[in-house]
Amino acid sequence: MKIVLLGAPGAGKGTLAKDLSIMFSVPHISTGDMFREAVAAGTELGVKVQNILSSGALVPDEIVNQVVEERLRKQDCEKGFIFDGYPRTIAQAIALDEILQKMSKKLDLAIYLEASEETVVKRLTSRRICPKCGKIYNLISMPPVSDQICDDCGEQLVIREDDKEEVVRKRYRLYLETTAPLVEYYSGRDILVSVNSERDHRKLVEDVSRLLKKVIS
């Protein structure tokens, strides 16, 4: 099962990908998480990425594609993968096709999560993350048991720089300019499915998992 999840920042790609990863036993590959790990490690790449993410801009394709190819060649991707946040552009989509072709593989499905700008802003500005274990919360839909404290490890939750409203709106505009055309790209290849991500998350997971079971059966 080889799929990509498309949609604006805050459409719910990461949460859905994690649920599907557990359900189907394939890795959830998030370039965003990889970059944040690099930032935390303080590597040269991490410093570059930190400056880019803090400004709300996108990481250059050359860096992204290199990280992706290295990840896909790991053994746990043999049976499939779920991409969250990649590809973001037509150029990245073409690069992914070329990477998979070298590995004698191809995408099974591209799932587009539809969400309005105001929904995205509301979700992301309410999002909090544990700096220690990486668990993600939402103060509205998935709050921690104790205010601003991680349920799992007791750390104080933080808001990421790229979840502040000004940056969120900038990211949404960038999404419209660069990522939205991917919907047409994958639709033209007849592997696109669009779903409404503004509904109850459990219902969304149920519907998407049912769809994927048909694809891999």
Curated annotation (Swiss-Prot):
One Pfam entry for this protein is: ADK
Q: What metabolic or biological pathway is this protein involved in? A: Purine metabolism; AMP biosynthesis via salvage pathway; AMP from ADP: step 1/1
**Residue sites binding AMP per the record:** T31, R36, A57, L58, V59, G85, Y86, P87, R88, Q92, R160, R171
Q: Which domain of life is it from?
A: Bacteria
Q: Which residues bind Zn(2+)?
A: C130, C133, C150, C153
Which EC number(s) does the record attach to this protein? 2.7.4.3
Which segments carry the region annotation NMP?
A: 30-59
Predominantly, its location class is cytoplasm
Q: Which InterPro entries match?
A: Adenyl_kin_sub (IPR006259), Adenylat/UMP-CMP_kin (IPR000850), Adenylat_kinase_CS (IPR033690), Adenylate_kinase_lid-dom (IPR007862), P-loop_NTPase (IPR027417)
HAMAP family attached to this UniProt entry: Adenylate_kinase_Adk (MF_00235)
Q: What name goes with this protein?
A: Adenylate kinase
The top of its lineage is: Bacteria, Thermotogati, Thermotogota, Thermotogae, Thermotogales
